């Protein structure tokens, strides 16, 4: 699997370099795409190593050295690169708000299985940030409704190969931003009937910002907001020279896979609240334009259970006015066993809207795949709210865009935090979306909605991480990321972020703490060349990991381990129908689930 992923990443690198527009600026990394592709992060700055998994504080309330909180908040605005000498789950006891700009967080450098951030969230509110290969799994242990990651009031952000799951709010929140990219991520399995004060959720992402790109992401196992396009908000007053919130919005959403949603309008939003965005002559200053291209929609058991008589690629919302939309090449998977038995889902109907995403809007066709909430489907509104191909071409996107089918194959093998190795959670979610297994896990609230969970405790793993949530309490229930037998740690004597053996191999000085920040012939710093090589598979970092690694995870409490084992034994070899109900005697030819596998009774 690792060699397959590496090969795919090298292919993606070639796609990224075959841009339609020649760029002189250096990309964040060679595979960077979209509006956030030119973030510089910690380039040329200092290195901070995370050396412990806890979220401890000193007696004066400052973060303990070696913690993630310390690495992200201490010091000044000098660019920094955060690397990891630990592996496992880091439970944040409170929100971690960035205090400085110009940060790279390189999860691919961790030993063992890598890094997961649980509990409270990281709040990105500073510019110029690169995040790669980190899992953000908030969970329901905290009492607050945290999104797994919150990005607001920031610009020049790129998030690559990360995973966002198990949030009581959206799994990823990103708006009031400019020049951002979310690429090759897994977003989903939001918690449904959890502890949120507003009740049931199961939301994937509220996403937008001015000049935002989302591409090659899997959005899965959520009833709604897959995504919710944030749109233009009411607060901006461009006529008075203010620009504090999203007001002139271009969002590009392409080559994503949406699986197992539960609402006809699970993609919606994109409002243009223009009530304050007018010049003195009354002309509109603010706008919202969403470009949706070649995304792949695959129904799942929650879609089937909803029995939807309508289904949309997107439904635009109104707040003052509707935004404008460009749709091209999006497709619903035909002949899927989870497609509801409704006219809107018949193969001939899907063929029409797959061939022309705007089919029937001007004529009011009942089974159209684009809709505006509350607006008539007619020729006038088509002309007003639909962008044409010339307007799409005018924004001059440099990215190479694949067909929906090609994107589906690549996303379902390569999205998420794949390094240092893929965990059990991401492996399952990719397999579900790819159709090699059917969703099995379900919460107690809606047992017919397979794949929709109430708590991370609804998921069973063959092996788990354990971590402290306070000074004395140990919890588990998260996928195993600790080191396996044979996993080691790289020695970095000078602390410049590069292993000693690598520096020697490259003709650098393993005792010079400055050479990592120096630019190479390629333009990237020597440290960036190492990080980029590890990420795209051209560098095997295990060749340089020669030092023994000692686990920092606490032992599992005896009573907790006993409960987990009892639940696992109860689940094993039990058969379930497609509504998640235990099944004693399947009927002939009946499809059922056993140990996460779809089977048919003979």
What is each model feature region?
Residues 475-556:
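Extracellular calcium-associated, cysteine-rich motifs in secreted modular proteins
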Residues 27-81, 577-584:
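Acidic Gly/Asp/Thr-rich repetitive segments characteristic of extracellular carbohydrate-active
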Residues 117-122, 142-150, 166-174, 195-209, ...:
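Extracellular beta-strand/beta-solenoid scaffold signature
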Residues 64-76, 90-104, 114-132, 138-155, ...:
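Extracellular beta-strand-rich solenoid/capping regions of secreted or surface-exposed proteins
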Residues 228, 252-473:
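Extracellular beta-rich repeat passengers
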Residues 552-579:
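Residue-level detector of functionally pivotal "anchor" positions at catalytic/ligand-binding pockets or at interdomain
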Residues 591-602:
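C-terminal tail/sorting-segment detector
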Residues 102, 106-107, 127-138, 153-166, ...:
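Right-handed parallel beta-helix
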């Amino acid at each position: 699997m690792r060699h397959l992923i590496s090969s795919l990443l090298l292919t993606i690198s070639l796609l990224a370099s075959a841009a339609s527009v020649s760029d002189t600026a250096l990309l964040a990394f060679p595979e960077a795409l979209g509006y956030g592709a030119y973030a510089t992060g910690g380039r040329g700055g200092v290195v901070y190593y995370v050396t412990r998994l806890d979220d401890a504080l000193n007696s004066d309330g400052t973060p303990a050295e070696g913690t993630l909180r310390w690495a992200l908040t201490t010091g000044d605005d000098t660019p920094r690169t955060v690397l990891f000498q630990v592996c496992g789950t880091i439970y944040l006891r409170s929100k971690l708000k960035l205090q400085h700009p110009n940060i790279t967080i390189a999860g691919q450098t961790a030993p063992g299985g890598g890094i997961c951030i649980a509990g409270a969230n990281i709040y990105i509110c500073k510019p110029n940030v690169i995040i790669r290969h980190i899992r953000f799994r908030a969970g329901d242990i905290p009492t607050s409704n945290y999104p797994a990651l919150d990005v607001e009031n920031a610009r020049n952000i790129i998030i690559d190969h990360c995973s966002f799951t198990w949030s009581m709010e959206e799994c990823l929140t990103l708006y009031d931003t400019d020049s951002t990219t979310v690429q090759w991520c897994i977003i989903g399995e939001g918690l449904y009937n959890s502890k949120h004060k507003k009740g049931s959720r199961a939301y994937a992402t509220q996403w937008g910002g001015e000049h935002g790109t989302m591409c090659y992401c899997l959005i899965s196992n959520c009833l709604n907001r897959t995504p919710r396009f944030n749109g233009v908000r009411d607060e901006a007053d461009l006529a008075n020279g203010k620009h504090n919130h999203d007001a002139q919005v271009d969002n590009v959403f392409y080559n994503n896979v949406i699986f197992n949603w539960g609402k006809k309008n699970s993609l919606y939003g994109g409002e243009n609240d223009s009530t304050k965005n007018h010049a003195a002559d009354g002309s509109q200053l603010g706008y919202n334009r969403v470009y949706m291209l070649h995304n792949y929609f695959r129904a799942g058991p929650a879609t089937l259970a909803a029995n939807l008589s309508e289904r949309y690629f997107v439904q635009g919302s109104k707040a003052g006015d509707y935004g404008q939309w460009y749709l091209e090449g999006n497709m619903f998977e035909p002949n899927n066993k989870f497609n509801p038995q409704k006219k809107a889902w018949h193969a001939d109907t899907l063929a029409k809207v797959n061939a022309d995403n705007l089919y029937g809007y001007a004529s009011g066709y009942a089974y159209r795949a684009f809709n505006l909430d509350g607006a008539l489907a007619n020729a006038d509104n088509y002309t007003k709210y639909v962008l044409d191909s010339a307007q799409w071409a005018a924004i001059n996107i440099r990215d190479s865009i694949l067909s929906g089918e090609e994107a589906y194959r690549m996303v379902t093998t390569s999205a998420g935090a794949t390094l240092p190795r893929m965990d059990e959670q991401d492996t399952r979610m990719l397999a579900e979306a790819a159709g090699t297994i059917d969703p099995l896990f379900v919460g107690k609230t809606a047992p017919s909605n397979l794949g929709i969970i109430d708590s991370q405790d609804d998921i069973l793993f063959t092996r788990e991480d354990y971590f402290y949530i306070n000074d004395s309490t140990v919890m588990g229930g998260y996928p195993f990321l600790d080191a396996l037998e044979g996993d080691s740690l790289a020695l970095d004597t000078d602390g410049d972020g590069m292993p000693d053996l690598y520096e020697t191999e490259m003709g650098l000085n393993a005792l010079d703490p400055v050479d990592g920040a120096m630019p190479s012939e390629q333009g990237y710093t020597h440290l960036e060349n190492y990080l980029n090589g590890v990420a795209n598979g051209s560098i095997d970092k295990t060749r340089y990991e020669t030092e023994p690694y000692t686990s920092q995870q606490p032992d599992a409490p005896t009573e907790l381990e006993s409960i987990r084992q009892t639940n696992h034994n109860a689940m094993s070899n039990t058969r379930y129908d497609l509504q998640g109900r235990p099944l004693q005697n399947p009927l002939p030819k009946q499809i059922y689930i056993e140990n996460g596998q779809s089977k048919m009774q003979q």
